Amino acid sequence: MYEVFADLHVHIGRSENGKPIKITAARSLNFANIAKECAERKGINIVGIIDCASPYVIEDIEKFLKTGDAYELKDGGIIYKDKVCILLGSEVETSEKGRNGKCGAAHNVCFFPHLKDIKGFSQEMSTHIKNITLSTQRSNISGYELIDIVEKYNGILIPAHIFTPFKSYYGNCTDRLKDIFKEKYDKIFAVELGLSSDTYLADMISELENKTFVTNSDAHSLPKIAREYNKMLVNDISFKEVVKALKNEDGRKILANYGLDPKLGKYHRTHCDNCDSTIETKEPVECGSDKVTFGVFDRIELIKDKETTKSPENRPPYIYQIPLSFIPGVGGKTIEKLLYNFETEMNILHKLSEDDIEAIVGEKIAKNIVNAREGNMKVESGGGGNYGKVKEHD
């Protein structure tokens, strides 16, 4: 077995012929470009593309498989240039009963082994979604109902960015996932933490103790791929092996979660848009404004059922790592210079010594990169849709 890097949440902005898929994502973010970016610049071995249920994207996948650069695996997934395994996924917004009798919405990332499976899923979901061609459209079914449809087409379901204020289970639907999935709760074996939380925070909720945590980028542009990712131990790169790693089966497992310090996330703390301030509070804000975004940290403080975090013994480490583009002094030209010399971001973040980096970009920037990848940079909390800020290490 060997170690690989996986980012299981990447969007598509446009189809190959320019049809809109994810309106808020970059036009350059199409199926082929994602595969190329992961192979040539990021060094990501497994990527989950979560807009593959769009008929426009299905057409692109069929063309992609005819190029000679890619092929489907028996164990699931598409291999690109023998470097990257692409998992075919779909992000689905479900309709839930929210808190205090209000309607809630939650996002789920669903993955399928083969093109025929996601085709079947797409066709069935078109009866539950008004416009199946677009990404993450609201469905008229709940997560409880969705998981049965996903399994019908040999797929898996992972609740996405579970604490995000607007479109997540804990964020605006429920205090307990078990209340949503009921007797099907054990079919959920992994959850996605999201950019504003980490293992320390999530493990304050008892029902998550037996769930695998995944950290993904939720990328809306090519540079944002792998801003969060996972290190896995697998026998090969395929859908089947990823599922085993998520289930901790046969020696396969998640070795580490690499993610932002939650303070850098856009929704870490509560934010009042009326007075444009990030508020540190454990209780709902009452300032007279109806434009208050309740933060992930503050939500967890309200719903946690443990006074101190306690992770199970098999929980992998969560390693704070700042993406190159967030690091002070590292602009586009510097990144291009680094990639020209060292090929991929994973090489820069995991394999190179400080001396190697210093030889290319100088002492100050090299020191910042090393401090960032070791979690030694100071950060200022984000909130209300604004990212936190990275400050240079003293």
Give each language-model segment a name.
Residues 10, 52, 92, 162, ...:
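Active-site metal-binding loops of divalent metal-dependent hydrolases
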Residues 211-227:
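Short acidic/histidine-rich active-site segments
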Residues 1-103, 368, 372, 376-378, ...:
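An N-terminally biased module of ancient metal coordination in phosphate/nucleic-acid-related enzymes
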Residues 320-342, 354-364:
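Helix-hairpin-helix
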Residues 9, 51, 86, 110, ...:
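Divalent metal-coordination and catalytic microenvironments
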Residues 3, 17, 58-189:
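Extended substrate/RNA-proximal surfaces in nucleic-acid metabolism proteins
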Residues 250-318:
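Cys/His-rich short segments
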Residues 191-200, 206-208, 224-225:
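Acidic/histidine-rich catalytic cores of soluble enzymes
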